[in-house]
C-alpha cells in the first residue's frame, strides 16, 4: 500500500482526493496539504477551500503550513508519506521539499504536456481552437510543468464546450489517470519519461482584460474566446443599449455562431452591432453574426439572451 500525501486546493482537485482516499486497497492518504482558509464574499469571512472541506469530511489530517517555512520538511517526514499527489495546489515547492519524499511529487496537469505548460491550459486550448486535449501525470521538478511524464490520456473538446465544462470532465477523468499512474509506479510497472524538447505554447493566466470580447474578428474566434473565458474570469463587453443609455457591462455566458439556415438570422452585421428578434439575439463579427444565448447584464441575474433583450430597450445597440 502506497502512503500518499495529497496536495490541492480548488474543486477540480476534489475528485482525485476522493478517489485516492476511497481506494484503501492501494493507497493510504496520510495527510492533505492545502492552502489556508481565505476571506470570501462581502463579509470577508474565512472559508475553507473545497479540498479542505472534502478532507475533513473524509476524516483526513489537514496541513496548511507554508512549504517555504523551515519546519515544513520535518512536518512532511512526520506524515510517513512515500509520494505526493498534486492537483492545483497553487504553491511553488522548493528543491528540499521535492527531495523530502522517497518517491517524489506527482502532478496532474490538464493538458498534453509539453504543450500548454502554465496556469490556464484548458482555457488556452479552447481559445486556440484545438480539437483534442487531455491530462498528464508527471514528476514535479523546479522548472514549471517540465518534469518527466508518467502517463497521459486524451479527450475530445466539444464544439460548444466551455472551459469550466471541459475542466470538470478532465478533473474526473484525470483522477483515474493519477490513481492508476501512482499504483503502477508503486508496483514498478512504469517509470517517468523525459518530456520531448522543442518549442511549445505556454498557458498564461487569463485576465479580466483578456476576457473583453473582440467582435472585430471572425465569428469562430469570438466564440472560442467566450468559451475559453467561461466561467472565469467571465467574457464581457461594454454595452451601449441606446443613445441615452450609459455604457454598462454585459457578461456573455453562452453564445454560438449563428445558424444561417434560420431565415430570421441577419446575413451580416457590423462588428459589435446587436439585432434582436423574438427568440434570438445576434451580434456582428467580421464574418457571420454570433448568436447570444445567455447573458448577465450589470446588476441583473443571468438569463436567456432573448428575455434580456425584451427588457433592455435596445435601439441601435452595440457592444465594444
Swiss-Prot record:
Role this protein plays: Attaches a formyl group to the free amino group of methionyl-tRNA(fMet). The formyl group appears to play a dual role in the initiator identity of N-formylmethionyl-tRNA by promoting its recognition by IF2 and preventing the misappropriation of this tRNA by the elongation apparatus.
GO CC list: cytosol
Keyword Transferase: yes
Catalytic function, reaction form: L-methionyl-tRNA(fMet) + (6R)-10-formyltetrahydrofolate = N-formyl-L-methionyl-tRNA(fMet) + (6S)-5,6,7,8-tetrahydrofolate + H(+)
SUPFAM superfamilies attached to this UniProt entry: FMT C-terminal domain-like (SSF50486), Formyltransferase (SSF53328)
Key word Transferase present: yes
The family this protein is said to belong to: Belongs to the Fmt family.
GO molecular function: methionyl-tRNA formyltransferase activity
InterPro entries: Fmt, Formyl_trans_C, Formyl_transf_N, Formyl_transf_N_sf, Formyl_transferase-like_C_sf, Met-tRNA-FMT_C, Met-tRNA-FMT_N
Pfam families: Formyl_trans_C (PF02911), Formyl_trans_N (PF00551)
CDD domains on file: FMT_core_Met-tRNA-FMT_N (cd08646), Met_tRNA_FMT_C (cd08704)
Binding site for (6S)-5,6,7,8-tetrahydrofolate: 111-114
UniProt gene name: fmt
Entries under PANTHER family matching the protein: METHIONYL-TRNA FORMYLTRANSFERASE (PTHR11138), METHIONYL-TRNA FORMYLTRANSFERASE, MITOCHONDRIAL (PTHR11138:SF5)
Keywords: Protein biosynthesis, Transferase
Name this polypeptide is given: Methionyl-tRNA formyltransferase
This enzyme's EC code(s): 2.1.2.9
